[in-house]
């Protein structure tokens, strides 16, 4: 307790985190892209290489997962306006939201129905490509749909993949690995939903369940993989490959906006609100967005009041040297995808200069907004995916933040507020009804 008091003396906002209050923190250390980019340790070239790799795999994905065929084997989601939800939020919170609210529907991505279809699938494909190239079975000029042949399945079956997950990452990696032919084990934390485990098992994935939280599942997965030289561990806490899989979203969103005739520049700022668990997904996406839109995009991470690991780590500068449990927070939240007690040190350090801020919200707030979105727009998401929905009213109410960035009322009126919906497209009907029943 004494240590917590010392921490609060240095970092007063910790008191609100400990009290589980909904908290907003605007990052005083935010810099321009030019200043912040060198600290990421990855470049635009790295993201372009990821983009090219996904293009090589497109013919394979189009055949392996027919639901991606219409998009030519690209796993990408729609961006839709949500005007009725915007009005509902203004009414419920008594706060005008200047500009236009949009929803990025990663919740409905093909194959695994969450943002994790970006990073998780990309890392599995990267590993498969590496093995096949090294074995001389493939060249980068080949049509990758050849990977569907029995010979390749046979080849990949001597290798295995392991990952620790609260659910969605395990789902995307499990489904993709099984399709390629890898043996795959997913180490699931206590928060993982039963339907996600059942779905994995139906794909022939081995699911190992833990009574503990995410950190333990990852640690056990890492240990199990170490004893097998043919086992590749996908490390959600430190993986640069996962991060790059998410980062590809930036250029793709830029292309979608261009198609829609939507302008992003100094006079038309873009605010993006990303739910954050360990940090890989939102970190990678935010990195890609910064590369695509530069200083005209402003990224915010959103976390549950019971799992504010990234806010705690970045705000104190302690990153992965502190966990929410260290300050007496239980890490128990209905937002199972965000139930992480210790943030990725890699992501926190890489992105701390490129984030405009982080905020927390209560589970009940997520349930309420889940219900409103279903009523107003007919879109159904899982609780975690609503974390970003609280962002626009916080930003529009933050006069000091607006002044610091010199936003005029005209600029704010021309703003786009993009809420990144991270999951929910595959939630079973009965489970969704339970979520909807909890909203007020």
UniProtKB/Swiss-Prot annotation:
Keyword annotations for this protein, in alphabetical order, are:
Lyase, Pyridoxal phosphate
Look up the record and name the cofactor or cofactors this protein needs: pyridoxal 5'-phosphate
N6-(pyridoxal phosphate)lysine, modified sites: 116
As its record notes, the protein acts as a catalyst of: D-serine = pyruvate + NH4(+)
Single annotated GO MF: hydro-lyase activity
Q: Which Pfam families does this entry report, sorted A to Z?
A: PALP (PF00291)
Which GO BP terms, alphabetically?
D-serine catabolic process; isoleucine biosynthetic process
Enzyme nomenclature, EC number: 4.3.1.18
- Supply the enzyme class, top level: lyase
**CDD domains, sorted:** D-Ser-dehyd
Q: Does the keyword Iron apply?
A: no
Lyase is among the record's keywords? yes
Which InterPro entries does UniProt cross-reference here? Answer: D_Ser_am_lyase, Ser/Thr_Dehydratase, Ser/Thr_deHydtase_PyrdxlP-BS, TrpB-like_PALP, TrpB-like_PALP_sf
Q: What family is it from? A: Belongs to the serine/threonine dehydratase family. DsdA subfamily.
What is the protein's quaternary organization?
Answer: Monomer.
Record NCBIfam families: D_Ser_am_lyase, PRK02991.1
This chain belongs to the protein called D-serine dehydratase
Native organism is Salmonella dublin (strain CT_02021853)
Underlying gene: dsdA
